[in-house]
């Protein structure tokens, strides 16, 4: 009977470890086979930048430089995951700015990079530069307008 308890205890540990691993795998999202990209604004030679991994810091544009702060994995489940801050994804945020938050596969983290240049969320909002192409300008989301230059982006390797 002592052996049976040991086996049962080991089995329970394996089940718990397996369940935790499954949850972690589900939340992580799979990176696209194409590798990381930069999201370059059509306003100029400026790219989407995550200068801080803080949830309270806005995403901004800065001159494109190819650093990990400006590189993004477009995951198979349509999340835009930071290379500099793995496990942190672009979130629609609030009315003030877009920001990074833990990748949890919420609808507010589902994005499509469209051929017309829009980076559109499943909530029908698009990434928008809030002003001109000056370094440090905040990026937010607004109603999508395919004619708005501040909503035009290119996905570049």
Curated annotation (Swiss-Prot):
CDD domains linked: beta-trefoil_Ricin-like
UniProt source species: Mycobacterium tuberculosis (strain ATCC 25618 / H37Rv)
Membrane topology: Single-pass membrane protein
Organism taxonomic ancestry: Bacteria, Bacillati, Actinomycetota, Actinomycetes, Mycobacteriales
Residues spanning the membrane: 6-26
Domain Ricin B-type lectin, residue spans: 33-157
Name assigned to this protein: Uncharacterized protein Rv1419
One cellular-component annotation, GO: extracellular region
Main location: membrane
GO terms of molecular function: carbohydrate binding
Domain of life from the UniProt record: Bacteria
Location(s), subcellular: Membrane
SMART domains reported for this sequence: RICIN
């Amino acid at each position: 009977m002592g052996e049976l308890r040991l086996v049962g205890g080991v089995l329970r540990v394996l089940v718990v470890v397996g369940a935790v691993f499954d949850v972690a795998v589900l939340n992580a999202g799979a990176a696209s086979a194409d590798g990381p990209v930069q999201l370059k604004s059509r306003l100029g030679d400026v790219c989407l930048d995550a200068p801080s991994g803080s949830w309270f810091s806005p995403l901004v544009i800065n001159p494109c430089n190819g650093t990990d702060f400006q590189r993004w994995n477009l995951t198979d489940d349509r999340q835009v995951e930071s290379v500099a801050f793995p496990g942190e994804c672009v979130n629609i945020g609030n009315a003030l700015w877009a920001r990074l938050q833990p990748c949890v596969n919420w609808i507010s983290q589902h994005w499509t990079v469209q051929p017309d240049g829009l980076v559109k969320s499943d909530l029908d909002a698009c990434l928008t530069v809030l002003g001109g192409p000056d370094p440090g300008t905040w990026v937010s989301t607004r109603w999508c307008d395919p004619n708005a230059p501040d909503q035009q982006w290119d996905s570049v390797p």
